[in-house]
Design a protein with these regions (language model features):
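N- or domain-start disorder-to-order transition segments that initiate the globular core
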Residues: 1-41
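N-terminal beta-rich core of secreted/periplasmic extracellular enzymes
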Residues: 25-42, 72-83, 89, 120
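Acidic (Asp/Glu)-rich catalytic clusters
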Residues: 40-43, 70-77, 125-130, 213, ...
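Conserved phosphate/anionic-ligand binding catalytic regions in large, soluble enzymes, centered on
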Residues: 48-61, 323
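Conserved, mostly hydrophobic/aromatic
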Residues: 52, 261, 327
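Short acidic, Gly/Ser-rich segments with clustered Asp/Glu that frequently serve as metal-coordination loops
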Residues: 54-57, 256, 264-270
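Active-site-facing alpha/beta catalytic cores
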Residues: 66, 79-244, 265-266, 270, ...
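Internal helix-turn-beta structural module
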Residues: 304-344
């Protein structure tokens, strides 16, 4: 094989033993999970915001940001459930660039996966302990989910991973909502097939074990836009797109039809300021149709402390080193605006 085996990494159980979750925090996560699940099963009409930095690059800034979210959450709790994004591993279009805290706990240092495993667990634990949030992360590597399985309340499977069998089967064994993004091509049948696979039980190999999964009835769709064969971005958040997904759900027989709309990526053509307009357009679409209202459960928004993005070596506190994000002032106002629109029945 054309690779060097550097060292054996600790198992998830070994990492959890070194950095255990106490019973009080476990109860907080359980309560969060219950509230979030009720949205996806239709028992609650609260609106979900999966919101936070494109990538969690440094612990201090991410925790600062999440504490700010906590203050806002308490003011909009009648309408909104905030699930902070703590994305600790990042897919890269060409394979080059910062791959997230799991790979590089210090973005300016060489990769160190052992330090990365510890860093991402500590970060998610701090979010729960200091702000009461059990957060969202992307399942880039299915075999790594168990390092954080007692801390996460939401998982996303990305556009480049959604066709992969191991991602689908692992999602079928999780007991939290898993969002399946449409692939970069925009083929909605791929996304629906992925949800179908995740909602059913399977026998497969996971971390060296033969396992049986029970199926995940809260696996659902994330619409993130798409790229055509010429490399041009196209949105899929408009009213007619939502109606099309609703029709696909009706034909599929899938449980708990649900959509989260990603306001960035190809939906915004990575024009981060467009996220504000897109969020409000989705809310308008919800107002226009009862079936869209029932299906669209929330939004995914990329947001941090400072507007825009930077190179990793610029070291501006709270500014994204991957995709550009909304800054805090715009984020806070957008959340308040969304809550007010919801209070007025959209």
């Amino acid at each position: 094989m054309n690779m060097e085996f550097l060292r054996k990494l600790p198992t998830p159980q070994e990492i959890k033993t070194l950095y255990p979750l106490n019973s009080e925090l476990a109860k907080v996560k359980e309560k969060n999970d219950e509230e979030i699940r009720k949205v996806f099963t239709g028992e609650s009409d609260k609106f979900i915001l999966v919101i936070g930095p494109c990538s969690a690059d440094r612990e201090d800034a991410v925790i600062d940001y999440i504490k700010r979210l906590r203050i806002v959450q308490d003011q909009v709790a009648d309408q909104i459930i905030i699930i902070p994004r703590i994305y600790t591993n990042k897919p890269r279009t060409t394979g080059a660039g910062y791959k997230g805290m799991l790979h590089q706990p210090n973005p300016l240092s060489d990769p160190d996966m052992l330090k990365g495993l510890v860093a991402i667990r500590k970060l998610h634990m701090r979010a729960l302990e200091e702000a009461g949030f059990s957060c969202a992360d992307e399942m880039l590597y299915p075999e790594n989910h168990r390092y954080l399985s007692d801390l996460l309340s939401y998982v996303a499977v990305g556009a480049r991973s959604v066709e992969d069998q191991q991602h689908r089967l692992t999602a079928s064994g999780l007991d939290i909502p898993v969002g399946m993004k449409n692939p970069t091509s925009g083929d909605l049948s791929v996304m629906m097939n992925s949800i179908n696979a995740a909602q059913h039980s399977h026998t497969f190999i996971y971390r060296g074990w033969e396992v049986d999964s029970k199926g995940n009835d809260t696996a659902h769709a994330i619409l993130r836009g798409y790229v055509d064969k010429r490399g041009q971005s196209h949105p899929n958040y408009h009213y007619e797109d939502l109606i099309q997904v609703h029709e696909l759900y009706e034909k599929s027989g899938l449980l708990n039809p649900a959509v989260i709309v990603d306001t960035n990526h190809s939906n915004s053509n990575k024009k981060w300021l467009e996220q504000i307009r897109i969020a409000k357009e989705v809310l308008h679409s919800i107002k226009s149709s009862e079936k869209v209202y029932k299906m669209v459960k929330g939004l995914m928004i990329e947001s941090y402390i400072e507007d825009g993005s930077q190179k990793a070596d610029e070291c501006v506190y709270g500014k994204s080193i991957t995709d550009p994000c909304l800054g805090w002032e715009k984020t806070e106002q957008l959340i308040f605006d969304i809550a007010e629109i919801r209070r007025n029945k959209c």
